[in-house]
């Protein structure tokens, strides 16, 4: 693989530190996980083999708890929504509650301080708790029951009423409408609050401002939002208009509170059926959103993948995605009507190999799908980000649906950055997503970032749970997930460091470090393996990948001018002859070192693969090397003879193989699990996958290095395309070059789409674990050759490599939460 590391910045970096990260590794202290406390005091936890065990919970116990959550979705009760359902009367009798079990639950679930809601021990009072408490008080007063509960609830509200006035406090969706609406109901029933009238007037003033303000969306989005919070509008709401948002399950936006308010104000029989079914299933309390199984389980799967621990739950994840797939093909509203849920489902299903088209995403092809929705009214960055990410999972170059979604969502996200109206934490997420598209992210690097930003239960006490109209804890077992992720990341770093030491020894043993021209970068090349094939059990695949990365880069330097024509031809003949190399001999010590490094390493890899492959596959490795050096020799001859290929196609006939992905993937594929038959290596599918990966790498390399290569007398695709479209020299050279870059980007995008389609499709001769290696390679190449902001610098790559292999996790926890790890 040809890395863009021949640039001046890397040369300076190598001269400053010839051993690269190996030197730092030898000086590195034992691994520790750095913990930042709430007061900013940094502590360190020395971790043994099992961090989870040292913190009081065995690894298998962590897995069992997470596995249980995956299998059984546990709905978080919403005191707010339960209170609204409790206010629904029996039809024909306004003096009798239709759902007495909801009243009973409210009376049994008041907290000692008089409040209701998701106020975990130690959490601060927030607007959600205040809203839930007021709703429960009003519900009890509606049926003239629970006088003591009402008294204690009113006392709590009086003590904390200031929270409702604090505009800096995070609020549930529509709080200024829902809270004031309940306050209006409460005063109408004769309830008296131990607060000043001016404070109550202040709440109604905030309500007036909310009703009059222009939000981020359109008139359509405002109507949808007002229907969503309709329980807070009372007589101001057009209840017939609300029914336009009724779903097939007869709810209003899957919201029990909005549906209950609709029944109360209009006695809608179909909406009542939704509530009857809901209360019957859950035996009393209701959640803030129902149904939410699909959303909750998708979030769990997505979280486990982002934290790097999904491999522990492959069976459960497969079952969940099978269920999601069934919902998708049946176009179920639970999945399809929510922008974020639909986009997440599309991304996960497609990346897991389910055969789905982008037709289900067609509803979001116009920006109006966002602007005219509740998401637009609330400026919902999370849903927009999910939509943007899903648009990048393109398997067809001419997929106009995903192309249009990606175009407008990227533009809106960029506008959010420019306007600076997005919360700081969300802003960082937007900037990161725009800088690193899905096809240019490396899993282990992403996972470390996610682990360090993951919120524990302790943090949620301070920062609050995800808020809809009321607090929503979801199905995430926060502390268990974090503990398992920290443990596995730490364990993998220990493995990575040992493998890096072994690779350093291999470099010395092969005598590659005696070659003055060799760019020996075991740390950087190993990073590309560890960041994609991160599970500890893929050790041999990582080592084979890295060894061949180092070898191909060294051989490329040799053919780029450090070897004479005689030496280059000699090396090509030796590799073609392979076991019969003794008949040819070596033209120089340099050639001898190179050949034996390739030959002996390939034989060792093949021998290690015998138990998995049930045969010796060294011939396939040797053949991949033959294709590679043959292409390199052709390019070298062009350079020495000052020959310019007449077409891009002629150039690519050699340049694709010379990019040298072949030896890397062929060697690593032997260790990823499945047995690879002769049929696999000879199949059109395998050859096409290899050609696409090499093409992607070659085009990325050409687009970044064409200016330097022109000065060196080398040709590449950008220059050739510009020459062929310059009108015989009559056109502008600059314009021709820009047109060439645009065309090559189009070809690159098409190749990337084709590769993803082959990698994710169901069936095929090449086993899925092997196919994934080609996608990993593509992601590495896009990351390495990233043009934006000059990211690919020596310092940038060094920092990324250190983050995965060396640097301890920076996990932010409150001191009282340390024991949960």
Curated annotation (Swiss-Prot):
Amino acids binding Mg(2+) 1: 556, 560
Residues binding Mg(2+) 3: 701, 705, 709
Native source species: Oryza sativa subsp. indica (Rice)
Record keywords, A-Z: Lyase, Magnesium, Metal-binding, Plant defense
Cofactor: Mg(2+)
Annotated GO biological process: defense response; diterpenoid biosynthetic process
Domain notes: The Asp-Asp-Xaa-Xaa-Asp/Glu (DDXXD/E) motif is important for the catalytic activity, presumably through binding to Mg(2+).
Effect of residue 661 to L: No effect on the catalytic activity
Known EC number: 4.2.3.103
Additional information: Phytoalexins are diterpenoid secondary metabolites involved in the defense mechanism of the plant and produced in response to attack (by a pathogen, elicitor or UV irradiation).
Positions bound to Mg(2+) 2: 556, 560
Summary of the function given for this chain in its UniProt record: Involved in the biosynthesis of ent-kaurene diterpenoids natural products. Catalyzes the conversion of ent-copalyl diphosphate to the phytoalexin precursor ent-isokaur-15-ene.
Descriptive protein name: Ent-isokaur-15-ene synthase
Catalytic reactions of this protein: ent-copalyl diphosphate = ent-isokaurene + diphosphate
UniProt keyword Protein biosynthesis, yes or no: no
Chain span(s) of sequence motif DDXXD motif: 556-560
Record Pfam families: Terpene_synth, Terpene_synth_C
Top-level EC class as recorded in UniProt: lyase
One function term, GO molecular function aspect: terpene synthase activity
